[in-house]
């Protein structure tokens, strides 16, 4: 009984025992009778607290006592950690006798080697406006930020969490804003989200953890939320997941990237991502584990749309078609070996597996990725040295596949500018490496606005990687046939661009030897202007003396090449003269009526130049004069590229403005109708890049009698059967004007003239 009294002393006080006036028991009444005064005298029942058996009474109500003993729930975040969802604590006077005790418990729960290594020493309000210094300042349902000695870092801590335990918080808080923003995100189109199983491998030293993730509309609400959940599941040593990369090295930047063709991702922390060789190695047993995972993942994709999705905050392991799978928001389930197979993942092994079930038309090029950009290399050999290239460029699908090279989409990660990645298989160049070496050495030297530029190169033991400028405007013929207006002045500007490129090359003693319309690409600039760019340097070489190799395309080959008397830089001027002639009338100056190459060569050697009516009636004499100077059989009398630029028809705008688009286009289609049409304007630029020096072997022949070997380069670059390659080549240019690349494009006044 004494112990009971001591416990209740804090809630009761001693009653004042002073007697009330006239309340003495048994006192005689004024009437002389014995009567009971006080409450009984008034007919009231005395309270037990005021009875003689209890000398104490309550000073606070039971409701107030219950409220004081009830624990207050509050959520605590780490200072500056935007990926941490917060930790809920129940705070009561029984559990924490002092504020320091709370700090000790928060340190034990929130501090580690990465986060708050000095422990929790300060608690801020969620907006950082003030510090909390006592337990009484902590309010029910509120959120707070824990820090060491550093100042408060302003972060939207409530962005990735919507506490459902807060029952007393009214509207107008930061949490309300977070919910409102979340609702606005839901309104955005999420049609690309389909049930999909992906594998996430954490970066770092081996053995590396790999977890399988199910993504659907219930588990993938936003990119930030998925990153947060991956952080919980993968548990990086360096802290939060800062970046996710595909096996190609492409960084995942939005939610939609998870639902592309990539199934495996590498989780990276704050450290700089390394494309080390060890990161790309898997042994056979690990490959088998991942291969089985992919087979199960494909089954999950098929049935995922019919099965109910997992809850984003599920607390129990989930399974797909009977196969245990780790859930992003369930860290406990990720620890089991069945739900998160732990294996030292590598890019090579994973890519081999993932490519087996993909078509070659996927965004990464399907099996072509294994051949060209995976560490396996083109021939299955390791070429992990190529991956620093991926740090700067994002590699896309295959856009061109030739006999010796593959061309892929290539985008600069920092500027967003598009390029073309040319990948040459060294195994196919065995014994002829000097040809490729010569071509690349020339590309390294040339830098001119009218020449397709080599941006960057990289070489491995098995492959040669060339980042090339990508020109999408079609070729020279496309510029004419796709326009609504084509004048003599436009032709003059085209010749200026070509002569400008030739003057630069010849100043370096470089001869191109394959000047033709399909190697002249139209570059379109943002301001609407255009210029020509010369490409395909497979036959180019440095002139150190007379050359005797008979090569080129028959329509544009110079007479000294056919005669085998030795030639030099001016063979390019002859080819430019043929192109100028075609630009103004639509047909070549030398042609065979019987379609015989020997007749064509005889006409070229004779050099008899005519300007037949009525096709040349409206062409200025200045243009005819320039063409005559360019098509001189006598090399000494032939003009140079510099003289072309200084000619009045080119430099002084002596050309006319009459529209001759219909006439020239009609003749082009009549005389250049024997090559395959391209699908779009980009195809032409890719074909030029795809050509290599090895593709030019068909354009090298010993004499004019060896007619079967001068197959045009355009047809050589496509995979044609050997029997087809031996067919006699056509006499006209191998590139006809295909379908218009664009419609309604007016060329008048839009051609650039780059001045050196």
From Swiss-Prot:
Looking at the record, the residues that make up the Doublecortin domain are 72-158, 196-279
Q: Posttranslational modification, per the record?
A: Autophosphorylated.
**Top-level taxon of origin:** Eukaryota
Which residues lie in Pro residues bias regions? Answer: 719-740
Compositionally biased spans, kind Basic and acidic residues: 7-19
Biased composition (Polar residues) is annotated at 353-364
Phosphoserine modification sites are 361, 646
According to the entry, every stretch annotated as the Protein kinase domain falls at 393-650
Q: What is its EC number?
A: 2.7.11.1
Tell me the compartments it is located in. Answer: Cytoplasm, Cytoskeleton
Q: Which reaction does it catalyse?
A: L-seryl-[protein] + ATP = O-phospho-L-seryl-[protein] + ADP + H(+); L-threonyl-[protein] + ATP = O-phospho-L-threonyl-[protein] + ADP + H(+)
In residue numbers, the region (Disordered) covers 1-44, 301-375, 707-756
GO cellular component labels: cytoplasm; cytoskeleton
Residues that the record marks as modified (Phosphothreonine) are: 61, 665
Q: What class of enzyme is it?
A: transferase
Q: Where is the active site?
A: 514 (proton acceptor)
GO MF: ATP binding; microtubule binding; protein kinase activity; protein serine kinase activity; protein serine/threonine kinase activity
* Effect of deleting the gene: Frequent spontaneous seizures that originate in the hippocampus, with most animals dying in the first few months of life.
Fill in the domain comment: The doublecortin domains are involved in the colocalization with microtubules.
Q: What is this protein called?
A: Serine/threonine-protein kinase DCLK2
> Where does this protein come from, organism-wise?
Mus musculus (Mouse)
The record lists the lineage as:
Eukaryota, Metazoa, Chordata, Craniata, Vertebrata
């Amino acid at each position: 009984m004494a112990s009971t009294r001591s416990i209740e002393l804090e809630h009761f006080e001693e009653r004042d025992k002073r007697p009330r006036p006239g309340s003495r028991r048994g006192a005689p009444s004024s009437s002389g009778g014995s009567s009971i005064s006080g409450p009984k005298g008034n007919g009231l029942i005395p309270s037990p607290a005021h009875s003689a058996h209890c000398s104490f009474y309550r000073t606070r109500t039971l409701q107030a006592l219950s409220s004081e003993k009830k624990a207050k729930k509050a959520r605590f975040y780490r200072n500056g950690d935007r990926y941490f969802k917060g930790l809920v604590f129940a705070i009561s006077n029984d559990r924490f006798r002092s504020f320091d005790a709370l700090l000790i418990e928060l340190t034990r729960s929130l501090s580690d080697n990465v986060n708050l290594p000095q422990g929790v020493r300060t608690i801020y309000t969620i907006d950082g406006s003030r510090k909390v210094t006592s337990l009484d300042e902590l309010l029910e349902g509120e959120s707070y930020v824990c820090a060491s000695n550093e100042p408060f870092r302003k972060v939207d801590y409530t962005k990735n969490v919507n506490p459902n335990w807060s029952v007393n918080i009214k509207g107008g808080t930061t949490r309300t804003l977070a919910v409102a923003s979340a609702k606005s995100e839901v309104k955005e189109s999420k049609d690309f989200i389909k049930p999909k199983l992906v594998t996430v491998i954490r970066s770092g030293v081996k053995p590396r953890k790999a977890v399988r993730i199910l993504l659907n509309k219930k588990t993938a609400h936003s990119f930030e939320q998925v990153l947060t959940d991956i952080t919980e599941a993968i548990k990086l040593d360096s802290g939060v997941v800062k970046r996710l990369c595909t096996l190609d090295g492409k960084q995942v930047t939005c939610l939609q990237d998870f639902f592309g063709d990539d199934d495996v991702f590498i989780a990276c922390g704050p450290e700089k991502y390394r494309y080390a060789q060890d990161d790309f190695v898997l042994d056979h047993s690990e490959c088998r584990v991942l291969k089985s995972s992919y087979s199960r993942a494909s089954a999950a994709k098929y049935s995922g749309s019919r099965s109910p999705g997992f809850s984003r905050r599920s607390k129990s392991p989930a399974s797909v078609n009977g196969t245990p799978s780790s859930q992003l928001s369930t860290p406990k389930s990720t620890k089991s070996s069945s739900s998160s197979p732990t294996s030292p993942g590598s890019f090579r092994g994973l890519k081999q597996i993932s490519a087996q079930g993909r078509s070659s038309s996927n965004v990464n090029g399907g099996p072509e990725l294994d051949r060209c950009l995976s560490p396996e290399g083109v021939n299955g050999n390791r070429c992990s040295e190529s991956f620093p290239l991926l740090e700067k460029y994002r590699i896309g699908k295959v856009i061109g596949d030739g006999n010796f090279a593959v061309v892929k989409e290539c985008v600069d990660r920092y500027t967003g500018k598009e390029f073309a990645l040319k990948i040459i298989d060294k195994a196919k160049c065995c014994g002829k490496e000097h040809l490729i070496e010569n071509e690349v050495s020339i590309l390294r030297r040339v830098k001119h606005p009218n020449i397709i530029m080599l941006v960057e190169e990289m070489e491995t033991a098995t492959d040669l990687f060339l980042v090339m400028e990508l020109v999408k405007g079609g070729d020279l013929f496309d510029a004419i046939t796709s326009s609504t207006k084509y004048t003599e002045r436009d032709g003059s500007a085209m010749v200026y661009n070509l002569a400008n490129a030739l003057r630069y090359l010849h100043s370096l003693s470089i001869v191109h030897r394959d000047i033709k319309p399909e190697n002249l690409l139209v570059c379109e600039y943002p301001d609407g202007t255009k210029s020509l760019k010369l490409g395909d340097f497979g036959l180019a070489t440095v002139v150190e003396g007379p050359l005797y190799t008979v090569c080129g395309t028959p329509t544009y080959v110079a007479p000294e090449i056919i005669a085998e008397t030795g030639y030099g830089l001016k063979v390019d001027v002859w080819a430019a003269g043929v192109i100028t002639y075609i630009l103004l009338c639509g047909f070549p100056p030398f042609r065979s009526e019987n379609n015989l190459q020997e007749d064509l060569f005889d006409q070229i050697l004779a050099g008899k130049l005519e300007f037949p009516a009525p096709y040349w009636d409206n062409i200025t004499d200045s243009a005819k004069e320039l063409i005559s100077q360019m098509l001189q059989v006598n090399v000494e009398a032939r003009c140079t590229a510099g003289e072309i630029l200084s000619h009045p028809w080119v430099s002084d705008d002596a050309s006319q403005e009459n529209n001759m688009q219909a006439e020239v286009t009609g003749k082009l289609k009549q005389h250049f109708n024997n090559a395959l049409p391209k699908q779009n304007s980009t195809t032409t630029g890719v074909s030029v890049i795809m050509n290599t020096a090895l593709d030019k072997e068909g354009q090298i022949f010993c004499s004019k009698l060896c007619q079967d070997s001068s197959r045009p380069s355009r047809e050589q670059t496509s995979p044609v059967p050997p029997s087809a390659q031996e067919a006699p080549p056509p006499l006209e240019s191998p590139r006809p004007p295909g379908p218009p690349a664009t419609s309604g494009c007016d060329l008048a006044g839009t051609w650039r003239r780059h001045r050196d």
